[in-house]
Amino acid sequence: MAEEFPRLNALDVAPEISLLDQDSNTFKLSELLGQKVIAYFYPAAGSPGCTKEAADFQDSLEDFKKLGFSVVGISPDDVPRIKSFQEAHELEFTLLSDPDFIAHKAFGAFGEKTLYGRKFRGALRSTVIIDEKGQVIDALYSVSSTGHTKALLKLLS
C-alpha cells in the first residue's frame, strides 16, 4: 500500500521547511514568523494550469498584501526552471524548489492523481494559509488552477 501523507487542518502548526528559492538562496518558513503566508503548491512550472494560477496570484498580489499576506509558490521543479518561470511571467513573489517533495509531503500536498487516464503519485495543487504564529488558518486541497485566487480572496476578506 502506498504511503499516505496527512493533510493539514486549521490550528495545526505549519511544518518547518528549508528549500532553495528561485535565486538559490535557502528559504526557511520559520523566517516568516510574524507574517501571514499563503503557501501554494503547484505541479509544474510552465504548464498551462500552473501558469494561469501563478498569473492569478500575481494579479491578486496587492490584494493579498493589503490583507497582510505574503505569497510563496512551491513546486517540484529545479531552481533554473522556477527562475525562468518567475522571469518569464514577471512574478513578484518567492518560488521554491522541492524536487524531492519534502515540503509537499509535509503539507499533505502529495498523493495519487490521474492525468490523461493514468494514475500516478505527485504534487497535488493545494494552498495552505498560515498565520503570523506559524499556525494553519486553513488548508485547501485539490484546488482548481482557475478561479482559485478569487475564492481565496473572498475567504480571507
Q: Where on the chain are the PLM-derived regions?
A:
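Chalcogenol-based redox active-site neighborhoods
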Residues: 1-157
